[in-house]
Swiss-Prot record:
Species this protein is from: Manihot esculenta
Function: UDP-glucosyltransferase catalyzing in planta synthesis of cyanogenic glucosides. Able to glucosylate acetone cyanohydrin and 2-hydroxy-2-methylbutyronitrile, forming linamarin and lotaustralin. Also accepts, to some extent, a wide range of potential acceptor substrates, including simple alcohols, flavonoids, isoflavonoids and other hydroxynitriles such as p-hydroxymandelonitrile, mandelonitrile, (E)-4-hydroxy-2-methylbut-2-enenitrile and (E)- 2-(hydroxymethyl)but-2-enenitrile.
Tissue specificity field: Expressed in the cortex, xylem and phloem parenchyma, and in specific cells in the endodermis of the petiole of the first unfolded leaf.
Cross-referenced Pfam families: UDPGT
Record-listed an anthocyanidin binding positions: H22, A400
Gene Ontology terms for molecular function: linamarin synthase activity
Record's protein name: Linamarin synthase 1
Catalyzed reactions: 2-hydroxy-2-methylpropanenitrile + UDP-alpha-D-glucose = linamarin + UDP + H(+)
GO biological process: defense response
Residues noted as binding UDP-alpha-D-glucose in the record, renumbered to the chain: T146, V360, Q362, H377, W380, N381, S382, E385, E401, Q402
E.C. number(s) listed in UniProt: 2.4.1.63
Gene this chain is encoded by: UGT85K4
Amino acid sequence: MGSISPQKPPHAILVPYPAQGHVNPLMQLGKLLHARGFYITFVNTEHNHRRLIRSRGQEFIDGLPDFKFEAIPDGLPYTDRDATQHVPSLSDSTRKHCLAPFIDLIAKLKASPDVPPITCIISDGVMAFAIDAARHFGILEIQFWTTSACGFMAYLHHIELVRRGIVPFKDESFLHDGTLDQPVDFIPGMPNMKLRDMPSFIRVTDVNDIMFDFLGSEAHKSLKADAIILNTFDELEQEVLDAIAARYSKNIYTVGPFILLEKGIPEIKSKAFRSSLWKEDLSCLEWLDKREPDSVVYVNYGCVTTITNEQLNEFAWGLANSKHPFLWIVRPDVVMGESAVLPEEFYEEIKDRGLLVSWVPQDRVLQHPAVGVFLSHCGWNSTIECISGGKPMICWPFFAEQQTNCKYACDVWKTGVELSTNLKREELVSIIKEMMETEIGRERRRRAVEWRKKAEEAISVGGVSYNNFDTFIKEVILQQQTQ
């Protein structure tokens, strides 16, 4: 790889979408680049900047001499602490309001004698306004799609669904009349798909729906970037990656899983950076240490999934009645519009085998030998961490491309099983027992371990992702710096 001078380090500006599952992988990328000698400016929205101060402390935001944090407004009400939990409002607001303040920030950084010249901007794939800002200043712009490759490809086909007259649906009867079982046979590299396996944002009766329009347009706009990087590895999604390269762009770099690549970072100060927007409860790790290998059901719905109180109780009694130990993440805002309340008899039932906490260091949990299965919403961050940990999945997708990831986990990678949307406790008991006690579960676990080994091979020295990351730095970023 090309050498980097400490006197003239390349300067990368990183811009995540303001949600936990997007901030995490951008932070991992920032640490990887910082370890290679880059100066990093990490740009949060003001709302998330304040959340990081609450969860990590002011000293975290102060950063390091060569790893700095900045903030831009997202256009949402300053007084609403949970504003970024409503994804349509957040997406619409970032698209409309972030470009101008981001341009101002770049101008400020360019004028500052205290920071190196800007080499590149690496923005989240759904923060594509950064492409316009980069073009304004003549700066290299790289899009980081934090989805799976199959999720990215599905978003690129929103416009094709409209062209074929599939979307919009005439009314909401499509949700229950079998329409979602219609095959989708026109996406290259993604065979055996049905409409229900497509990202949930296609389920609209109006093509002007905020999220349908937002994801489709952001995906296509990202093709204008100088390069695209994905937190995946070739063998996991080879067919769809080949199709993306053939049809859209060859400047796509698979450089994951970051969670494993990050382990190779030398012991520098930025390696300890964690970007959780909630305070992480570390007591869960001691609790896991006392459990038998592969004995614990780990449950986490991600950072924005919300459920009803009725669903909360079905999950609670399903976990309790399975009789297996479980670690259950119950965010303070997980129940729509109210606090999560469970009956005293539930806590009495699970006191010796269940632990409920509000947030955990998930990467460490999924690497823990006590965890036997992960009940997940199938967000890509969680899915790739699960693959990296060699854990099978119980899939309960909520929205976005989680449905697509679920399809691949269950039918392609064969590491998962899917729960019904309208979950009942009896089904959860049955699925947990299947995954923890039967040959079906043992086979899913064997497959998960195989995928973990393949992921480790990809990021090892000489592996495909390792080499792709080197090539990305040398031929995309450093080549630009020397021009």
